[in-house]
């Protein structure tokens, strides 16, 4: 039982059903498969607690949910783990999308765009712990994947981690692996294997439609989330209109207590995206009440 005495559960209702129904009234929208980019895989909280499970409900009847379960004594993945993950997807691409590939810690730092040697030394134990968190956290998806073949969500349960890894020292390396140790200062290399669900879903449909360097330049995790969402939702269109509530529920950001604060938070992220030329422009429409606010977002030609 994952709910032992030491573990605490935090539940959050994202109530996506109503926003999806609203979205599907718009007949010119293509129903795209919901993929892992759209789930709160990486927590946006900077107050993560040890042994805390997060459970996100995507329907009022609790039939559709994502549960993120840390290893015992650990915390769930957050902002650092997302940056490591994006860097690993880039290394994966450079290795021809093979599910298992080799890399060094310096490869990860290179792809995270961390160049300063002292910063690397400081971050080394944190990135190593982050890699461990990607391997040891369980993600339990219930009724969340949409099949375009069937034309409906699939009624299933998936329990998976993001990846597994093997840390290999020179004395244990085979002939192929020893070639990585040409640099004698290197202590170990990593054989990384993405789980089938993440390899199939993220790699084929998700993060690899994005430029990893562009994502990593967005320092704020909420802004990064908003960018990935609006990019996916707009598809090839140069204009997107979305309710603030809809955006907030998918990050996720708190809504019920203070919609005004959340709308202004989204607005700040959109302003940052505009300032850095990720989007062309945007307009906030309050529509009399903050609860009814929406955003119009404009993009440059692809």
Where are these regions (language model features)?
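Charged, alpha-helix-forming regions
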Residues: 1-302
